[in-house]
């Protein structure tokens, strides 16, 4: 008797490419360039076939139509290159399954034009879609407050119409984050970028952040934790490009996060940021600081003051210098803010970075470290990561008693390589 071998199952990306009805050439190009990356990352994080299929389908049907024209003309502030899409993977020392996440700024053909100079309409369209999806626990009350406080209104848009905004790095007003959960559901996060609002209203970034936190207090009272954060940032200086984040859940359960940055990338600055200038001291913070030093040494970040050019890095000869970034997470009823630091690895040798992360994962007891290097290489077939410096974007680090080390790695998330070409070569096309 002849036994026939069962044909291998079609991978979710290939199956969906045949199954879904992509409505335009733009969607088809974006799907090949970003959907394929999402597929590789989901597979590398050991998502099941069913989980991969569900999340890829969500991406194709809900997000992909809101990437707008290809190639894009509006540059998003969520990535150094201006790409409106960024993938990351979260690792937890306690052994929880890996979680793939999407950072996303919706775009359309009018983004950046006089009809929508600051790309506000697409975000509202996506919010409407999310409202209709019946996501468990989904709540947009904080979004409404953040949009009111942190984004420009019609009158302000008109006042800015003739303003010189330079490279436009602060044009983005809002963005979304999506955690692709193992049960097939998604968790949604929101982001607001108040820099433009500060410019037109004359309010400082400190005033802008304090105003929103105070207005949110009846819904989610984080005033005690914010007081510590604000005192530290008043002492050291609020970054003019700071931004804000929250969860789309019932407000009292939401985390509030204030993101800020510095051009100083030194161990002394990291330790200061971690403890808010010694304002937060306890055994958990001390243990986290030890792990933070371990990771800092393994990644081998260039140590010193960085010359930051506020512009996108989307060509071979554009500036790759990237600032230190961090956020302070605040929860209702908890007087102590939690620090998460984002190592600015964009601009560092990619293989050096991924080797350092792999070794760190092994040292903290996660077997993912053994296969990490090869998995990251699989995202970029045909590219020698020992010769590149821009495919790894950020490595973030936090530490709690519950999760242990909480580490996320962020990647350039398109098959396009914008850094193959110089600005002059691009202008001649």
Swiss-Prot record:
Q: Where is this site: Required for regioselectivity?
A: 103
Q: What class of enzyme is it?
A: transferase
Instruction: Give the record's GO biological process terms.
Output: alkaloid metabolic process
Q: Does the keyword Transferase apply?
A: yes
Keyword terms = Prenyltransferase, Transferase
Q: Where does dimethylallyl diphosphate bind?
A: 101, 189, 191, 257, 259, 342, 406, 410
Q: Which InterPro entries match?
A: Aro_prenylTrfase, Aro_prenylTrfase_DMATS, DMATS-type_fun
**A family per Pfam:** Trp_DMAT
Q: Which pathway is it part of?
A: Alkaloid biosynthesis
Record EC number: 2.5.1.-
Summary of the knockout phenotype: Abolishes the production of okaramine B and leads to the accumulation of cyclo(L-Trp-L-Trp).
Q: Which GO terms describe its molecular function?
A: prenyltransferase activity
Q: According to its UniProt record, which reaction does this protein catalyse?
A: cyclo(L-Trp-L-Trp) + 2 dimethylallyl diphosphate = cyclo(N(8)-(alpha,alpha-dimethylallyl)-L-Trp-6a-(alpha,alpha-dimethylallyl)-L-Trp) + 2 diphosphate
Q: What does this protein do?
A: Prenyltransferase; part of the gene cluster that mediates the biosynthesis of okaramine B, a prenylated indole alkaloid that possesses an unusual octacyclic ring system, including a four-membered azetidine ring and an eight-membered azocine ring, and that exhibits insecticidal activity against silkworm larvae.
Q: Which family does it belong to?
A: Belongs to the tryptophan dimethylallyltransferase family.
> What PANTHER family has UniProt attached to this entry?
INDOLE PRENYLTRANSFERASE TDIB-RELATED, PRENYLTRANSFERASE ASQH2-RELATED
| Protein name from the UniProt record | Prenyltransferase okaC
Species annotation: Penicillium ochrochloron
């Amino acid at each position: 008797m002849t036994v026939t071998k069962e044909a291998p199952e079609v991978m979710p990306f290939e199956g969906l490419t045949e199954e879904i009805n992509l409505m335009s050439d733009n969607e088809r190009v974006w799907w090949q360039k970003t959907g394929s990356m999402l597929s590789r990352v989901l597979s590398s994080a050991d998502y099941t076939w069913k989980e991969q299929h569900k999340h890829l389908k969500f991406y194709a049907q809900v997000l992909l139509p809101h990437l707008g024209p290809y190639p894009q003309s509006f540059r998003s502030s969520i990535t150094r290159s201006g790409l409106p899409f960024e993938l990351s993977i979260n690792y937890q020392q306690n052994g929880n399954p890996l979680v793939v996440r999407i950072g996303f700024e919706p775009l359309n053909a009018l983004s950046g034009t006089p009809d929508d100079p600051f790309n506000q309409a697409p975000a509202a369209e996506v919010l409407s879609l999310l409202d209709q999806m019946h996501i468990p626990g989904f709540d947009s009350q904080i979004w409404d407050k953040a949009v009111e406080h942190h984004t420009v209104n019609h009158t302000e848009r008109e006042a800015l119409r003739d303003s010189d905004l330079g490279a436009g790095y602060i044009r983005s007003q809002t963005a979304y984050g999506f955690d692709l959960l193992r049960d097939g559901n998604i968790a949604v996060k929101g982001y607001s970028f108040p820099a433009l609002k500060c410019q037109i209203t004359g309010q400082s970034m400190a005033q802008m952040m304090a105003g929103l936190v105070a207005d949110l207090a009846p819904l989610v009272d984080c005033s005690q934790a914010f007081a510590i954060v604000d005192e530290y940032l008043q002492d050291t200086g609020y970054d003019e490009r700071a931004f804000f984040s929250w969860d789309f859940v019932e407000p009292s359960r939401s985390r509030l996060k204030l993101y800020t940055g510095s051009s100083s990338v030194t161990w002394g600055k990291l330790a200061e940021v971690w403890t808010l200038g010694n304002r937060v001291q306890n055994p958990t913070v001390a243990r986290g600081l030890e792990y933070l030093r371990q990771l800092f040494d393994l990644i081998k970040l260039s140590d010193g003051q960085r010359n930051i050019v506020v512009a996108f890095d989307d060509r071979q000869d554009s500036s790759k210098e990237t600032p230190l970034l961090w956020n302070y997470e605040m929860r209702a009823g908890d007087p102590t803010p939690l620090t998460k630091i984002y190592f600015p690895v964009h601009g560092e040798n990619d293989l050096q970075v991924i080797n350092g992360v792999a070794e760190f994962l092994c040292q903290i007891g996660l077997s993912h470290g053994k296969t990490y290097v090869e998995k990251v290489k699989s995202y970029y077939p045909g590219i020698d990561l020992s010769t590149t410096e821009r495919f790894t974007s950020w490595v973030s680090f936090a530490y709690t008693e519950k999760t242990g080390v909480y580490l996320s790695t962020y990647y350039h998330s398109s098959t396009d390589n914008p850094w193959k070409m110089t600005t002059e070569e691009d202008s001649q096309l």
